[in-house]
From Swiss-Prot:
This is Lysyl oxidase homolog 1. PANTHER family: LYSYL OXIDASE HOMOLOG 1, LYSYL OXIDASE-LIKE-RELATED. Residues 311-369 are annotated as: Interaction with FBLN5. Residues 255-268, 313-332 have a biased composition (Pro residues). One of its GO terms (cellular component) is extracellular region. The lineage of its organism: Eukaryota, Metazoa, Chordata, Craniata, Vertebrata. Residues 1-25 form the signal peptide. Catalyzes the oxidative deamination of lysine and hydroxylysine residues in collagen and elastin, resulting in the formation of covalent cross-linkages, and the stabilization of collagen and elastin fibers. Essential for the elastic fiber homeostasis and for their maintenance at adult age. The record marks 95-96, 134-135, 151-152, 216-217, 337-338 as: Cleavage. The lysine tyrosylquinone cross-link (LTQ) is generated by condensation of the epsilon-amino group of a lysine with a topaquinone produced by oxidation of tyrosine. Proteolytic processing by a furin-like protease causes removal of N-terminal propeptide resulting in an enzyme largely inactive, but further proteolytic processing by BMP1 results in enzyme activation.
Amino acid sequence: MALARGSRQLGALVWGACLCVLVHGQQAQPGQGSDPARWRQLIQWENNGQVYSLLNSGSEYVPAGPQRSESSSRVLLAGAPQAQQRRSHGSPRRRQAPSLPLPGRVGSDTVRGQARHPFGFGQVPDNWREVAVGDSTGMARARTSVSQQRHGGSASSVSASAFASTYRQQPSYPQQFPYPQAPFVSQYENYDPASRTYDQGFVYYRPAGGGVGAGAAAVASAGVIYPYQPRARYEEYGGGEELPEYPPQGFYPAPERPYVPPPPPPPDGLDRRYSHSLYSEGTPGFEQAYPDPGPEAAQAHGGDPRLGWYPPYANPPPEAYGPPRALEPPYLPVRSSDTPPPGGERNGAQQGRLSVGSVYRPNQNGRGLPDLVPDPNYVQASTYVQRAHLYSLRCAAEEKCLASTAYAPEATDYDVRVLLRFPQRVKNQGTADFLPNRPRHTWEWHSCHQHYHSMDEFSHYDLLDAATGKKVAEGHKASFCLEDSTCDFGNLKRYACTSHTQGLSPGCYDTYNADIDCQWIDITDVQPGNYILKVHVNPKYIVLESDFTNNVVRCNIHYTGRYVSATNCKIVQS
């Protein structure tokens, strides 16, 4: 009886187990390949010694066509390194801009050309500036949202965001203005408002190790996540050194940098921080105006005030400068043999500093006058004869640079003129600028040469007989424009051949090459023989100079009728 009862119970258990297995197999067969809790694909790679894993619960091949929202798979990125705990919460954080889907687009698509962002192509939410991804504890939050059948059966749009409101860094200063918004936020106002909210229930756990299943898990109600992790920094691998802690930086100035008002301007409105003069020590009263401050004052003010060693953006003490000098009338140099009035030597020295046309004078006691000196070697170096037709000398004929026979009625354009060409270089070795004597509004414009003539007679060119000293050729008055062609080392070019800046600076040269118009003497009617070439600069002494005995150059000329040679060029008194 007992044996029969036991065998009956055993048979019932066997049939019950078979029935359970059969029912479970029938229920698992329809969804056998779509278990969302099973990882079906695994991709592993190694970067800098760290192993990363990408897991996918979906199938490897996805058929074409719209996919149902129930068949969405999960993707998980594991193996991100654990952030070191030593990094402070105030360290700079990395921002990540996820892509927001447009209506009718799959969440993985990006829109090129519609919104550019420093993080790459794609849509950016309106709060991308105020959200930080990740923190020093190695935790991050993400959310997922699945839009169900937008626009009547279109593909489901998936948006993944790694932004979390709990990790927003609150500034330590009071907020006076709202956060600035990106200019392209208005393009996406038709989004689902639910996609802009944050799901506080989703938590992404970063694993402690680098293995595949080392505790990496994601729990989401929607079942579709894209936990994008920021790239690991160098110090997170243990190879970096301890970084200094810096205060957090936001869109507004940190409280550690308070506003400093600018210093008040000096009373006279002049910046005297770099006004030290190399010539001030030689003037009388320098020690009284600039007493020796001593080492204590130098340390207090940052250096010797006489040398302008003041801290940046600071005004020097007003007592370090002497009182301003009263403006004196300009000194007009005139040649007079009258005796100077009492105290005239002192007054003349002070007036000479403001002399007309005086710019550079190392000697403060001199009046400052120019001194023109022609170069005899330059004239002798390249003197030659040129034959040219009259039609090619029309510009020179307008300026009266030819002999009188060139203007005769019987002269034709095919007549040949013989020209004695030579260069000229004049140096101003004085202590003041050589300026034109004519006012600027009276300068003469020559349209053929396209420049202004600021002087009527700058040079005279004459050819004299070597035996008698008489003129054998009709020279002319060269009225070129004055300019600084070249300058000695340490001198700057300040004048040019323009309508308002003509002159000759001290230490500079006004050069006229032998191939320019009017740099010649017309010797068409001169017979071969020995002659003297005379070049006279500032011939009528209209502009006052410090020395008039060095303005003339004489050269011995031997003319054969075919060529010419110049010898023994030197400076003479007249």
